[in-house]
Amino acid sequence: MMPVYMDPSQPCQMRPQEYYYQGFGNNSQHMAMDAPPPCHGSCVHGNFPAYWPPCYPPQVPYHQCCMNRSAFHPPHASYAPSCYVHPPFPVGYQPWFDVEKDVPGKHHCGKCSSQMCDLKKDRGVVIEEHEPEIEKGEAVLPVRSTNCPYPIIWIPHENARNQEYRSSLGLGKHNQPPAEVRAPDNMTIQKSFPESWRGCFPFDESSMKSLVQNQDSKKAQNGKTVEAPFDISKFKSLLQGQDMKEAQIQKNKEELGQLTYPTSWVPSRRKRDDVEASESSNEDRKKMQNGKTVEYPFDISMIKSLIQGQDVKEAQNQKNKEEPGQVPYPIFWIPSYGKRKDVEASESKESSNEGRNLESCPSDLHRNEGQITQAKGKEGNFECNVLSDAEEKSSVINIPVANHLQEPRNIPVKLSENHLPKPTEPTKRIAKNEPVKSTKKEQSSSSSEASKLPPVCLRVDPLPKERNGGSKSVSHPKRMEKSKETKIAAPLSSKKAESRTVPEACNVKCEDANAEMKMAEGSLNALRTEKGSVESNSNLQEESNGEIIKPCEAKENREQPAKKSFTEEEAARIIQSMYRGYDVRRWEPIKKLKEIATVREQMGDVKKRIEALEASTDQHIEEKEIVVNGELVMNLLLKLDAVEGLHPSIREFRKALATELSSIQDKLDSLKNSCASAEKEAVKEQVEIKSQPSDSPVNLEHSQLTEENKMVSDTNLEKVLRLSPEEHPMSVLNRTDEKQAESAAETEEGYGLFETLATDSKQATENAAAASSTTIPEKIGEVETVVPGNPPSADGNGMTVTNVEENKAMVVESLEEPINELPQMVEETETNSIRDPENASEVSEAETNSSENENRKGEDDIVLHSEKNVELSELPVGVIDEETQPLSQDPSSSYTREGNMTAMDPKTASQEETEVDHSPNNSKGIGQQTSEPQDEKEQSPETEVIVKEQPLETEVILNEQAPEPEITEPGISKETKKLMEENQRFKETMETLVKAGREQLEVISKLTSRVKSLEKKLSHKKKTQIRRRASKPMSVSPTDAVL
């Protein structure tokens, strides 16, 4: 026969567990063997392992699963071979998964799957094996093995009571158990192994009964508890075929409230006579041994009740009554969960009785209660006048506190004479079986406690927690305070105070109710709400104060006004007014008006600051304040723009504020312009102050010469204008080729430079300042070279005088017109500086030539000057006039004049003195000879520097050099030093002014860029706001559709 683990038809390919086959004699080796797995008929585990001999003959036909009787045994089991004998039926077996579904046909072994056991069904569910969750007290046996499907059961042998067994444990004999738990006298010592070790289950019931009777399943030896490892009552129930689950449930119900720890019970007041009965009940089933509480895991009385059918509880109570003196000290008992309600009810009744007694009995009786009860106890009378429960309810009123979890407080109230209850017959109380001494002690202890504390009904409870209308308590907080005041004010010994406090509270409540009714007459809504409150208040007063508040109720009922009914028109008006109010509130006009008011206040502050700016004189501070105020105005405009959704009446206010702010902005712009003009004027004033000359004869002569030159220039302008354009080509042909080229180049450069350099004013000032210091000496030198050649030409020719006068007039005109245009022509200075040596060579040639050549040169010069003047006069007049007007006022020509004087040598000065002293013809000759260099000096860098600030006094530089030789040589040296110093100062001031102008330009450019950025932001915000407004109805529509 194939072994089990090699058979492919068997799903479990594991070896079966080893188990013991029934042997012969007193062989106890089976205690170390495991039981075999059970078989229920559907699975056959009859194949033996390979190392055992094959089963011949085949398996015995009968099987324990197929038998109906639980106590079936094979005949002559002891004489049958071990391979043919089946294991006995497991007595303590229960199904693996569920106890209630104990059907033999539906169960299979734990090692087989459900698919093999139930082949008829097409579907099979594989159940995962796991440990069942067994509640406490529902286990079949106390020990459960997870590896083996059956529990391990151990029954204590009879040798457990043996003295030797106790001595082996090392226990002495000095601690003996009490008489009621000692072992029976007929117990004998067995040296051999007990019979319970032999044979298999089931045992005889008689032997089990004797075992249970002789051994109480637990025994206290030498002051310690010996516990049995299993519950015999449960085991007995299995033998008798009872349902252990129902028995366990019944046992739990019976043992409800049984505590597993030592407890103590202090009896309540008026319940001390029941202490003895509670001691005799002994519901917790604890044994007191040598001053220690012994606790057992199972109930011995239940086993006896199952076997003998006796009520162990009654027997134990009778035994305790018969032997009352065995317990050396009293047992204190705490009532179980089910009995606590009765105790609390009794305590509440006692407290109510005390509250009623307070009305009829003085406080001295309560204080001396112990003495009175002792005296009555001696006489044997325990009688007292007690009211019934109905009378207690009528006499004592329970007022609930806001906190429902607390117990109700009992407040005594004195009733009228008509409503006092009639005294009833005294009721007898249960007398105690204890002696009078014990009662005296107990009553004395109660009297001492009563003397320390006041009665329960007059104790003041802590203030209840206030609740915001969530509680269902009927009492109002104000009324609760009034009632508390009455409680505190009431003394313990007087009745009058108690009778007065409650009516006062009633009057206060009535007055409060009347005041509320008067306030309710104001509006319709208040009337409706106050109706409910009045009704609730009346109910409150009825419940709290009983019949005393009836007159207050009558007053309230009289003062209630009739309900007002509205017509349709009145109701429509009310509804419309309410809706209009809601519609106005929806606009939020107050909030937006407040925002506009804040903007208006800030605007007033800005106005004050602007007025202060107008009054101030500091230019630097003004510029900064103007910028700050401009930003403030822009912020206020933004705030006004942010106020949206205005009512039409409010929009007008916003428009007015916006116009005021725009006017303020215009004022700030005008202040900016005025500040700029003021800066220019201040710069001019500073220059004038620094350029004022000292009072000297030289300065006076210069002033006189400037006036004369102005007059000459005015008279000679007409002559130049009368020149016809036909004379120009004739004069050009008579000139030499070199002069024609020079004149043509000069005119072309004049036009081109005027157009290209019209925008570069800054570079012109810098180059002019640099060139002025270098070019002055060269030009003065040129004048010196021209002077010595004049006398011979002047003496011999009469034509030269007229030519010289004409040349002077032409020089004046030529200096007036181009000087106005030269501030923007900086590059022309370089070309003129290159031409200076050519002019010098021409002057030297003029000295060597004869008088005839000189006359020709004079005529040619006049023609050239006329050409230049005509060409320059054709330029736009507006450009020239704009620059000449501010510059003509500058009196700084003295600096240029003095600068020219510094470069002159003392030798040239002496030569000029000699030439000027001869005759006036020399002066005319000087003018005639210097006509050409003067034409070139008009475009030189020296004239450019002077043109920017003093255009009219450049004429003086050329014509004022005649009177200078009057000064002596030592005087010239000192003045030249002063002039040099003043020239340097002038240069420094010019540089500082140029830098300041640049800084101002930068600031202006930054401000303009900032203003542009702010304008862009404003435009962008307005666009986004418009888009958001347009998108609102789109966002609302889908939600409305969904709703």
Curated annotation (Swiss-Prot):
Comp. bias regions, Basic residues: 1018-1031
What tissue specificity does the UniProt entry give? Detected in stems, leaves, flowers and roots.
Q: Where is this region: Disordered?
A: 253-294, 311-331, 343-366, 410-500, 533-566, 724-749, 764-799, 817-975, 1015-1043
Do you know which PROSITE patterns this protein is assigned to? Answer: BAG, IQ
Q: Which GO terms describe its molecular function?
A: calmodulin binding; protein-folding chaperone binding
Which residues does UniProt call coiled coil?
971-1024
Record bears the keyword tRNA-binding: no
**What region holds the IQ domain?**
568-597
Compositionally biased tracts (Low complexity): 840-852
After gene disruption, what is the outcome?
Early flowering and shorter vegetative and reproductive phases, with more branched roots and inflorescences. Early senescence. Hypersensitivity to light. Enhanced susceptibility to B.cinerea and permissive fungal growth.
- Here the segments flagged for biased composition (Basic and acidic residues) are 311-324, 343-357, 416-443, 478-487, 550-566, 724-741, 853-871, 934-951
Which SUPFAM superfamilies does this one have?
BAG domain
Domain BAG: residue ranges: 595-672
Q: Which GO biological process entries does UniProt record here? A: autophagy; defense response to fungus; induction of programmed cell death; positive regulation of autophagy; response to heat; vegetative to reproductive phase transition of meristem
Q: What induces it?
A: By heat shock, by salicylic acid (SA), by abscisic acid (ABA), by calcium, by hydrogen peroxide, and by pathogen B.cinerea attack. Up-regulated by HSFA2.
Q: What is the effect of changing D760A?
A: Abolishes processing by caspase-1
Q: How does it assemble?
A: Binds to the ATPase domain of HSP70/HSC70 chaperones. Interacts with calmodulins CAM1, CAM2, CAM3, CAM4, CAM6 and CAM7. Interacts with BAGP1 and APCB1.
Q: Which PANTHER family match?
A: BAG DOMAIN CONTAINING PROTEIN, EXPRESSED, BAG FAMILY MOLECULAR CHAPERONE REGULATOR 6
Domain comment (free text): IQ domain mediates interaction with calmodulin.
Q: What else is known?
A: Overexpression of BAG6 results in a lesion mimic phenotype. Processed by APCB1 during lesion mimic development. The cleavage is triggered by pathogen infection or by pathogen-associated molecular patterns (PAMPs).
**Name of the protein:** BAG family molecular chaperone regulator 6
